[in-house]
Amino acid sequence: MLLGVNIDHIAVLREARKVADPDPLDALGICKRARADQITIHLREDRRHMHDMDAKNIIELSALPVNLECATEPSMIDIACRLRPHRVTLVPEKREEVTTEGGLAVTGEQTRLQEAIKRLQEKEIEVSLFIDPASDAVKASSDLGVEWIEFHTGKYANIYAMLYSNLSKTHHSIPELKLPRSVLKKMLEEELESLSALSAEARVLGLKVAAGHGLNYHNVQAVAQIEEIEELNIGQSIIARSVYTGLEQAILDMKSLL
C-alpha cells in the first residue's frame, strides 16, 4: 500500500499567523526519510493554505512524486500544465467549505473534465479524479480515459468517528449521523463493502485506485485491507500527530498500519 502524505496543513499552520514559518518545503526530506511514497498538495483557488510559490518549489524540489490536487477551472489547469507534477487529481471546490466535501460530479461535468484531462495528458501528467464511491462515477471516470480515481472516504470516516470517538459529544457532532450504534455499525459495514466492490469494478475497467479524506490512525486499517486500493492520501491526521511526535515518527506510525 502506497502512502501519499498531504502536507497542506503545514501551510494551514503558517497561514494562521500570516507569517513565513513553518514552510511546507521543509517537510520534503522528512517525508522521504520516513518512506512516504508521494507528496500530495492542494492548490485551492482561494489560496487559503498552499500558494503558487509553494506548489512551484515543492514540485521542482521534491525527490518524491508530487500529486497536485486542483479544481477544473482553466486557470488552475494552466498552472498545473506549467508546473507539470507527476499527477494531478481533479477535485471539486466550494469557497465556503472547510475541506473538500464530496467527489466530482463526473457525470454532469464531462465537457469541462474532458478539456482539462486532455490538456494535462498532453503534458504527460497522470490524471486522477476525486470521486464519491458510486458505480456511475467509476464508469464515467473510465470513459474519460484517466489513469487513476481516488475515492472520497469522508462518509466512512464520519460514520466511524460518530461510532468510535467522542465526536457525537462535541460541537462538531454530525446531526444526520446521531443514530443508534447498531445503525451506525451497519452503515459502516455497508460503506466498506461498497468501497471494496467499487474498487474491484474500477480495476476491471483498468483504473488504478486511491482513497483518501478523513483517514486517520484509528480508521485506516479497514480501508488499507481492501486489496484493489493501491494508495492512500492522508494529511490532517499525520500533521496533527506530528505536533507531539515529530513528522518523521508520525509518518512511520501511519506506514506501520498499512
Swiss-Prot record:
Q: What does the UniProt keyword field contain?
A: Cytoplasm, Pyridoxine biosynthesis, Transferase
Q: Which Gene3D superfamilies match?
A: Aldolase class I
Please give the Pfam families that the UniProt record associates with this protein.
PdxJ (PF03740)
The pathway where this protein functions is: Cofactor biosynthesis; pyridoxine 5'-phosphate biosynthesis; pyridoxine 5'-phosphate from D-erythrose 4-phosphate: step 5/5
Q: Where does 1-deoxy-D-xylulose 5-phosphate bind?
A: 8-9, 44, 49, 99
What does the protein in this record do? Catalyzes the complicated ring closure reaction between the two acyclic compounds 1-deoxy-D-xylulose-5-phosphate (DXP) and 3-amino-2-oxopropyl phosphate (1-amino-acetone-3-phosphate or AAP) to form pyridoxine 5'-phosphate (PNP) and inorganic phosphate.
Q: What is this protein called?
A: Pyridoxine 5'-phosphate synthase
Q: Which gene encodes it?
A: pdxJ
